[in-house]
Structures are given as C-alpha cells and as structure tokens.
C-alpha cells in the first residue's frame, strides 16, 4: 500500500481499533470466557457492518456509523476500500504472508440491488454479487455460501451458516471471509518445544507445550503488563504484520486488561515494543482456537439496535417496496487462529500518531507466558487489527 495514509483514513483506523477493543471487552465479559478461549476478526466484522451501512438509511445508518466510530459514512467506505485493496492484499507471491479476503452479497432473485449500492459494494468493497433462490432453494443456498467461505479460508472455516439459518423468508445475505497465514521472521526450533505448567484462572495448572527461544525479542514491560511483538516475514511491499502477546503480571489480570484497552485504545500503541532485548527466560505456549458466535447480541450490547428490529431502514440496498420490511435477523461470525513454531494460520468470516515516551526495558528480563493472556494480529504500517482474542487454556481448541 502507499507509504503514507491520509489523516482521515488514519482517524478511521483509530475508530476501527476502538471498535475492536470494545468488542473484545464485550466477549471477555461473557461468563463462558472464564473457561474458554476466544478469537474473532474485528476487521472482518467492521467491513461487513460498513457494507450494511451502505445500504441503510436514516436513523439506522446513523446508528451503524456511530457504533463503528464514524460521524460520516463516507469515512467508512474510504477505510474499507483501503483495507480491502491494500491491507488485506495477498503478499505470498512477494515473500510475505498469505492473505485472502472476499466479500459476498447474495440477493434473492425476486429483488434487484439498487445500482448505487451495487456500485459501491463492487468498486470499493470488491464484493461479488450473486442472485440466488432463497424462497425455494434455501438449503442449496446455505450450502453455496458455506462452500464459498470454506474455499476462501482454505477449509479452516466450515458451515458458517448453521442448518436452518436460511429459510424462505431470507432475502439477502452479506458476508465476508478472511484467511491469514504468516511465518515468523525468527522461527522457533520445534526440538526445543517441551511441556510445562500453565496456570489457569482458578489457580490450578495444566501441562501444555511451550516454545522456547534464547534469541533477543521485541518486548516492553511497564504498568503491570509485558508485551511481546513477533514480526512475520515481510514481503516486498511496505506492510509489516505482527502478532502481539499481552501478558498481565497478575494471574487474573486478563479481564481488567481487556477493559483498559476498551476504555483507552491508545494504551496498546503506548506499550508496543520498539527494540529487542536480551532474555533470561522465554517461553510461549502453542495454541489453536476455533470460535463461532452469533454476533447480534454483542452488537446490541454496544448500542446497535435499529438494524435488528422492526424499525430497521435498509431501503438503500434493494429497488423494491419490500425494502421497507428488510431487517437483519442475525450475524454469524467464525474465527480460527493457530500459533506454532513456524508462524500463524488464521481465518475469519463475517489517527494521530501517539508520541511515545516509553521507558527502556531492563537489559535482561523474563517473558514466560504461563497464565492467561490476550493476543492480536496487526498490520503495523496502518494499525489495522486483523484478529484479537484471549487464551485461558492453551489445550482447548474450541
């Protein structure tokens, strides 16, 4: 992508980051999060909701834009265009991560998309528009959408639409799918991997495989938090993808950290490590997470209510009197993240720069990820967060 981003796009990315951390905090506040790992793709959800905003009118459009952090919907579309065309462009042919992203609009054959919506969806969101028969072939369309997602995510996401989720009352399905596979710049030696104790939130421990390294690492340490940056191999463009491990010092500090990030999105930028440091000990657990959610309740908790009810105004999507009766019944989202010695495989479907005054880390420290932590995958040049989640038990995969 371009070496510089316009100020308005950077501001939109800051809003997107805030949306990401608000969602992460909402997911972590779920009682099930105390015993289950979680992962989701904020950029996937953000793009999907931005596309819905393009087809919304009146108060519904305003509420969508406000939830996504934008006062003007044009900012959402400009950001989506940058994200889809540049941030999420594949870099495997130039030595970088394998990235695949696709948007889809599946509309019932009885309806016609409004030309203005279709043009925006195709030109800015690079969406593929397909006419389908929900009214008599709902099961076949379900299989078609699931097959599309499975193909984009190279088989990692299956059955995004549960059986029965589409029926003869469905008129429109908007979706996207994201796949990411990156290799670490400095890979771990699998021969050094060995099991050790990981402490759960209840104070008990389990034996789980840890990756070890004696190399210097990008680490910051302050405010009761240690942050590890693991860069992925960079391609021949300006993008730089990295995974971040956010480890609170306190065993039970995961939830307060999630709340802190939600309240102060700039907190992450202030703690991103800028230099490598020598380590006395370093160990990071391998983990794999697969999570499927129906996201409408989460979004309602963030104040997004109108698109899901009788007052929804999605009249800018289709050319039909029926447009006044359209509303969103559900938003399905699935994510998969795997971290091992060679790198990360991940998939999902559905700013003024801070001046840092970061204290230099100690010359030698430990980074031992032996209790619950947050993680995220970010494109550092733009600041776009692709995936975010938490691990409370590395042995749980779903």
Swiss-Prot record:
Keyword field contains Disulfide bond: no
A Pfam family this chain is assigned to: Serpin
Assigned GO CC terms: extracellular space
CDD domains: serpinP_plants
Region annotation RCL: where it falls in the sequence: 343-367
UniProt keyword list: Protease inhibitor, Serine protease inhibitor
Keyword Metal-binding tagged: no
Annotated positions for site Reactive bond: 357-358
Disulfide cysteine pairs (residue numbers): none
InterPro entries documented for this protein: Serpin_CS, Serpin_dom, Serpin_fam, Serpin_sf, Serpin_sf_1, Serpin_sf_2
Domain of life: Eukaryota
MF annotations from Gene Ontology: serine-type endopeptidase inhibitor activity
Domain comment, as recorded: The reactive center loop (RCL) extends out from the body of the protein and directs binding to the target protease. The protease cleaves the serpin at the reactive site within the RCL, establishing a covalent linkage between the carboxyl group of the serpin reactive site and the serine hydroxyl of the protease. The resulting inactive serpin-protease complex is highly stable.
Family: Belongs to the serpin family.
Protein purpose: Inhibits chymotrypsin, cathepsin G and trypsin in vitro.
Name of the molecule in the record: Serpin-Z2B
């Amino acid at each position: 992508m371009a070496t510089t981003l316009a100020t308005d796009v950077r501001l939109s990315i800051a809003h997107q980051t805030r949306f990401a951390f608000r969602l992460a905090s909402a997911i972590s506040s779920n009682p099930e999060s105390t015993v289950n790992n979680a992962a989701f793709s904020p950029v996937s959800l953000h793009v999907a909701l931005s596309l819905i905003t393009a087809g919304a009118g009146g108060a519904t459009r305003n509420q969508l834009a406000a939830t996504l952090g934008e006062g003007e919907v044009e900012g959402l579309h400009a950001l989506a265009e940058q994200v889809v065309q540049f941030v999420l462009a594949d870099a495997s042919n130039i030595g970088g991560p394998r990235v695949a992203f696709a948007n889809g609009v599946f509309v019932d054959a009885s309806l016609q998309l409004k030309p203005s919506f279709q043009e925006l969806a195709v030109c800015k969101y690079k969406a593929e528009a397909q006419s389908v028969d929900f009214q008599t072939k709902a099961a076949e369309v379900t299989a078609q959408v699931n097959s599309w997602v499975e193909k984009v995510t190279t088989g990692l996401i299956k059955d995004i639409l549960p059986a029965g989720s589409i029926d003869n009352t469905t008129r429109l399905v908007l979706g996207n799918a994201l796949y990411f596979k990156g290799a670490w710049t400095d890979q771990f030696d699998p021969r050094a991997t060995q099991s050790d104790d990981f402490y759960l939130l209840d104070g008990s421990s389990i034996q789980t495989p840890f990756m070890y390294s004696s190399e210097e690492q990008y680490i910051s340490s302050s405010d009761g938090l240690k942050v590890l940056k693991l860069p992925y191999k960079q391609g021949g463009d300006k993008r730089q993808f990295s995974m971040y491990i956010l480890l609170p010092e306190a065993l039970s500090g995961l939830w307060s950290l999630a709340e802190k990030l939600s309240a102060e999105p700039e907190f992450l930028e202030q703690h991103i490590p800028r230099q490598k440091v020598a380590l006395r000990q370093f160990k990071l657990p391998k983990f794999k997470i697969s999570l499927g959610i129906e996201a409408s309740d989460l979004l309602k908790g963030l104040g997004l209510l109108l698109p899901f009810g009788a007052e929804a105004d999605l009249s800018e999507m289709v050319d039909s009197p029926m447009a006044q009766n359209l509303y969103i019944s559900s938003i399905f989202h699935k994510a998969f993240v795997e971290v091992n010695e060679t790198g990360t495989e991940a998939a999902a479907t559905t700013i003024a720069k801070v001046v840092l005054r970061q204290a230099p880390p100690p010359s030698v420290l430990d980074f031992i990820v032996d209790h619950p932590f947050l993680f995220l995958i970010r494109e550092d040049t733009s600041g776009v967060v692709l995936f975010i989640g938490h691990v409370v038990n590395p042995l749980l995969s779903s």
